[in-house]
Amino acid sequence: MVRQSIGLIALQLLNLVSVAQAATDAKRDLSEKPKMPYDPNTAADCTWWIDNDGSKNCEDIPEYWDIEMVDWLMWNPSLTLDCGNFLKGRSYCVEAKSVLPTQTSSSTATTTSQKPTATVSPLPQQDGLTKDCTKYYNVQSGDTCQKIVDQYMTFSLAEFNKWNPAVGPDCRSLFVGYYVCVGVPGTPTKPIGPSPTQPGIPKSCNKYYKADRGETCQGIADKHRLKLNDFYKWNPSVTNDCVGLWQGYYYCVGITPAFELKAFYHADCTGKLHGQTTIASGSDGACFDTNCQVASIDTFIVGDCPNGQVQISYWEQPGCTGKWFGYGYSSRGTCRKLWTEGWKFKAVHLRCASEKDDCVSKRTCTYDPEPSRGICM
C-alpha cells in the first residue's frame, strides 16, 4: 500500500511538472513587446505578441491562444484571409485593447468555425478592388504586378489589373503594405501547366515543351512551327539571346487565342471568304481591313475573351483611320451581321471588351454620324 501511494504521488508530481513546463514554454512564446520584426500595420494597441519560430501553423494560433480568427486577422493585417503570409522570423499580435479576446468555456468555443469567412476583408485596400474577391495578398517591398502574377500562376496580368484597377495599367500605384485581390470565384487554386517553369509564361498557354540538353530557342521554335519572336514573347525569362533556356524546364509553345474569326461576303456567313484572323490573348486587339468585301464575321467558339464578348469598332478607312462610327458586339461561337452589311466602312478593330464598359455606354465619347450613303461605290 505504501509503495502504491508513493508511486501515485510520484505520477501526480510528474504531471504537475509537465503542466508547469507547458505553461513555461507558452510564456516563452508570449511577450509584451515584439522580439522580431513585425508588419507596421499590425494593431498599434497590441498588448501581447508571439514570435513565429516556425513551430506552429497560422491556422492553429487562434485556438492555441483562445482568440477569434477574425481578431487574429484584424490585429495582423499582413496575413491573408486563408492565413497565408505567416512568415517565420516575424512577430504577430495575439491580444489588443481594441478587441480583447473573451474567455469562453469549451462547450461554447466549438460552436463557431475558426476559419475566416468571405465577409472578412483585410485592410488597407485601394479603391475599386473587386467586391467578389475571395483571396488577398499583402504587397511586399520589391513586388511588381507581374511578379505577383508569376508567384501564383493562376490568373493573368489582365485579370489582376481588372480586380485591382487602382494599381493602374503600368502598375505604378502598387503600394507596399496594401492588400490586393489575387482570386475570385472560379480562379484555379493550383498553378496552371506542368512544372518546373520559369516566370512570365502567359496563363493562356495551352501547349508546353520540355527543353532537352543542347537545344536552342530557334530549334524549339522550328520544331513547333513558331515564329522565334512568339517563343520569346511567351517565354520572357529566356531573354532574346536565349541564355535563359534551361534543360529540364517546360516552355510555352502554344497559346489559346483571345478569339479567332472568319470574314464572309454575305451577311449570313456564307459566300466568298475574305480572310481569317486570330487575336492574341492579352493583347488590345487588332485592325482588320474589310475593304467593302465583308458583311459578316463568324467567330470561333474557342478563345478566352471574358464572357466570350468581342467588340467590333467600325472605321471609315483602311488601317482603322478616318471617321469612327462606334461599336458593335458579337460573341464566340456566333455569326454576326456587320453594321450596314459592310457598305459604310472599310475597317474594323477587333478586341475582347464588355459593352457596359465602353465609352459610348458610359457617355464619355461620341461617334461620327452615319454617312448618308455607302462609301464603297
From Swiss-Prot:
Disulfide-bonded cysteines: none
Domain notes: The LysM (lysin motif) domains are small globular domains involved in binding chitin in eukaryotes. Lys2 contains one LysM domain.
PANTHER family, per database record: AM15, PEPTIDOGLYCAN-BINDING LYSIN DOMAIN
Keywords annotated in UniProt: Chitin-binding, Repeat, Signal, Virulence
Protein name as it appears in the record: Secreted LysM effector Lys2
Annotated Low complexity bias: 104-119
Species name: Pochonia chlamydosporia (strain 123)
Domain LysM: residue ranges: 135-182, 207-253
Signal peptide, first to last residue: 1-22
Location of the region described as Disordered in the Swiss-Prot/TrEMBL record: 104-124
Function: Might have a role in sequestration of chitin oligosaccharides (breakdown products of fungal cell walls that are released during invasion and act as triggers of host immunity) to dampen host defense.
Molecular-function annotations in GO: chitin binding
SUPFAM superfamilies membership: LysM domain
Miscellaneous section: In plants, chitin acts as a microbe-associated molecular pattern (MAMP) that is recognized by lysin motif (LysM)-containing plant cell surface-localized pattern recognition receptors (PRRs) that activate a plethora of downstream immune responses.
Induction per the UniProt record: Expressed constitutively with no significant difference during colonization of banana roots.
Pfam families: LysM
Family: Belongs to the secreted LysM effector family.
